[in-house]
Amino acid sequence: LLENPIKQAIAFAVINRSMTRKITMGHFGHTQALVYASDPERIKRNRSLVRPIKEIFEEILPKYNNAVFDNKQDNQSFHKNILELLPTVENVDLAYFDPPYCDSHADYQGFYHLLETYTEYWKDKEFVNGIKRYEPQRVSGFDKKRDVLNSFEKLFEFSEEIPHWLISYNNRSYPGIEEFEKLISKYRDVKVEAKTYHNGRGGKGSVAGSQEILFVCKPKKKHFVSTNQQQELVNEGF
């Protein structure tokens, strides 16, 4: 119905947000979701549980439309593996990385694939054993202990030309905070900020008492000169 790809993207964003408003346990993979959604006490706290998705969509659509503005810049958006993307981009000042919380027991595909599956209209999806598993399984390289250290090494090597990094993390993740800080320190000066969850919000990563971590990374104290800047200096005779 919508031929404009930008309007299509906004519509998908709104319908996905409408669906997440009906989540009961922090994700879509909980087998007791319908039971919890029928609990009168839960309904009191979240009326969206019993509201039609269309009604929620119509309520929040104006907010999304009002958020659209022209920043007078040429903007780009990418949807691909970060290790494939980084070698292709340049002139980036700041990178924010939000990797999966390895070893937190969060099955991101099982918990949240519904949104992508809906948006892609079941493209290339094959469900196996009823609703228990689906194919193809996608592996990021950051969610298995055997792969994650090597993947982070590649991530940081490919990000050498980006001066500043922000990295979201969780103190329940692998590698641990000290080991991860040591790994980052090979490439950047790093400061660690922590925020403790006092209440659980669903999912293993946000249980009460766990900490959300932010690694604030900046160039080492010696003056940072990117490869592009080095070439400019050479061209100018320095």
Give a label for each model feature.
Residues Y96-D98, L166, V216:
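Structural motif
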Residues L115-E157:
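Glycine-rich S-adenosyl-L-methionine
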Residues I177-E181, Y187-Q231, E236-F238:
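Class I S-adenosyl-L-methionine
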Residues D107-L115, L183-S185:
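Glycine-rich, phosphate-binding/catalytic loops in enzymes
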Residues V139-R188:
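Conserved Class I SAM-dependent methyltransferase catalytic core
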Residues C102, R138-S140, R172, K220-K222:
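Short, glycine-/Ser/Thr-/acidic-enriched flexible segments
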Residues I82-L85, E153-F156, R201-G203:
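Generic recognition of flexible, low-complexity loop/linker segments
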Residues L1-G110, K123-Q137:
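SAM-dependent nucleic-acid methyltransferase catalytic core
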